[in-house]
Amino acid sequence: MDIGLREWLIVIGLIVIAGILFDGWRRMRGGKGKLKFKLDRSFANLPDDDGDSAELLGPARVVEHREPSFDEQDLPSVSAREAKERKGGKRQEEPRQGDLDLDEGLALEADPSDAAETVEPRKGKSKGRKEKEREKAPAVAAEPAPVDEVLIINVIARDESGFKGPALLQNILESGLRFGDMDIFHRHESMAGNGEILFSMANAVKPGTFDLDDIDNFSTRAVSFFLGLPGPRHPKQAFDVMVAAARKLAHELNGELKDEQRSVLTAQTIEHYRQRIIDHERRSLMQKR
């Protein structure tokens, strides 16, 4: 029996659909688990100004001769613990930087002190601007839930000098991030730093923290925004706020957006992140039944 053109098209279509479904299943399986920030010990093709090589997190894709390279081997693997029952509230479209109007009567279930193990706490902290910033952060004490997966957006400076401390601080403060636990920045429900934590931003260079007392002399080649799942009460809206903050930083400080694999962050990648959030919410609902 001869097979016509129509039958061949049907067979080819079924094969393509099966391939798409398998690729989506593989990506979801590969995206689960704990966040691993990789701290590198060297940059490729960068001048050695002071004898100390910069150290960036994770493997890098070299897109030009000034782009940093990342070694997978001698790098410590650190797990993210940004696990909080948090509240968020924004629509699916690009959010504005402002307070999130969420239910105020719900109990907070987060522990900012366990926000991320990607950074190393500093010893002998001084009482300068750090103390003032920390007074703005709410004190929350609750047992964190395990993190299933973490959504990461990296912003890498295009300039060799990196992001300068004062300009970086001004930019992220305008986006509502506030300095807090683990010596990193957190975005709360309110722009004033009140309410539940939606996402956080860590320094992508060792030790992964920020020193506000020496911010005038501070610079870094990259920062990492991250949001843990399970986490905010409204993770899709919180993710949109995180995307807006990362885009603002990249646009105003001449940075480049990268995903968790150090590939260029495209609109398709952002939609894939949103789909991961939807899939995680669906799995959580099924487990509760």
Curated annotation (Swiss-Prot):
Periplasmic membrane side: 1
Source organism, top-level taxon: Bacteria
Residues spanning the membrane: 2-22
InterPro entries: Cell_div_ZipA, ZipA_FtsZ-bd_C, ZipA_FtsZ-bd_C_sf
Region (Disordered): 66-141
Compositional bias segments (type: Basic and acidic residues): 81-99
CC annotations in GO: cell division site; plasma membrane
Membrane topology according to the record: Single-pass type I membrane protein
This protein's UniProt keywords: Cell cycle, Cell division, Cell inner membrane, Cell membrane, Membrane, Transmembrane, Transmembrane helix
GO BP terms: division septum assembly; FtsZ-dependent cytokinesis
Cytoplasmic side: 23-289
Residue ranges with Acidic residues bias: 100-114
Keyword Cell division attributed: yes
Location(s), subcellular: Cell inner membrane
Pfam families the UniProt entry points to: ZipA_C
PANTHER family: CELL DIVISION PROTEIN ZIPA
Subunit structure: Interacts with FtsZ via their C-terminal domains.
Family that this chain belongs to: Belongs to the ZipA family.
Function according to Swiss-Prot or TrEMBL: Essential cell division protein that stabilizes the FtsZ protofilaments by cross-linking them and that serves as a cytoplasmic membrane anchor for the Z ring. Also required for the recruitment to the septal ring of downstream cell division proteins.
UniProt protein name: Cell division protein ZipA
Gene (name only): zipA
